[in-house]
């Protein structure tokens, strides 16, 4: 017997089975997936940083 993992859709909170049956996981639908993408694109969501913005002078792609 296999255990079924269920997560909540990050957009609407609906339960989503984590497996092949849910192609948009962790989202419940393409709609919720696109809503989330739109929030990231509009910079409504961001990853928190503990870095100091004044250290940005040291950020360089040149080594």
UniProtKB/Swiss-Prot annotation:
InterPro entries assigned to the protein according to its UniProt record, in alphabetical order: DNA_gyrase_inhibitor_YacG, Znf_NHR/GATA
Record organism: Salmonella paratyphi A (strain AKU_12601)
HAMAP family linked to this entry: DNA_gyrase_inhibitor_YacG
Subunit (UniProt): Interacts with GyrB.
Name under which the protein is recorded: DNA gyrase inhibitor YacG
Pfam entry (one): YacG
NCBIfam families according to UniProt: PRK00418.1 (NF001638)
Cofactors: Zn(2+)
The entry's keywords: Metal-binding, Zinc
Co-factor binding comment: Binds 1 zinc ion.
Family note: Belongs to the DNA gyrase inhibitor YacG family.
Residue numbers binding Zn(2+): 9, 12, 28, 32
Gene3D superfamilies reported in the protein's UniProt record: Erythroid Transcription Factor GATA-1, subunit A
